[in-house]
Amino acid sequence: RIVMLWTTDEEIGSETSRQAILDHADRSEAVFVMEPSLPNGALKTSRKGCGQFEMIVTGVAAHAGIEPGSGASAIHEIAKQVVELQSLGDNDRGVSLNIGTIQGGSRSNVVADEARASIDIRVPTQTDALQVQDFLRRLESKIAGTTVKVSGSFRPPLERSASVIRLYEMAQRVA
């Protein structure tokens, strides 16, 4: 039995196709991902895992001119968290992090009571993914009156292994 499954939402995390992918993968002995080859035409036998996360920080709104001390800025907190998140990146090991968007606040004269950041993290191994998830789970607020919550998950990496190489060699022979 051969199943071909085309999806169109890979670049946004396979949100609608994820379950179909998992269902077919669970019933399959082998899976080929028909992603474009490398620039020199070489096939890929490994692929980084991709983590898509959202950080939501809540604070306490206050008038910035009348009583700024009664507020707790979600924007100031998220700025501190972004600096800490940068420690996750390690280009030498292939771990990359991008804060794609930050949103927060309502007006310049109001201490922001909410801020959000979208986070993209790429990892070469499942061990790296677990370490990153643990790091994100342990984040704590640094400013009194704020809270930090992170949600999201990883699409696991394809790590080069003996079984992956065997499948690659079989595909080469058949081609």
Q: Model segments located where?
A:
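Acidic/histidine-rich catalytic neighborhood of metal-dependent amide-processing enzymes
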Residues: 1-48
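Metal-dependent amide/peptide-bond hydrolase catalytic core
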Residues: 36-41, 45, 51-56, 60-175
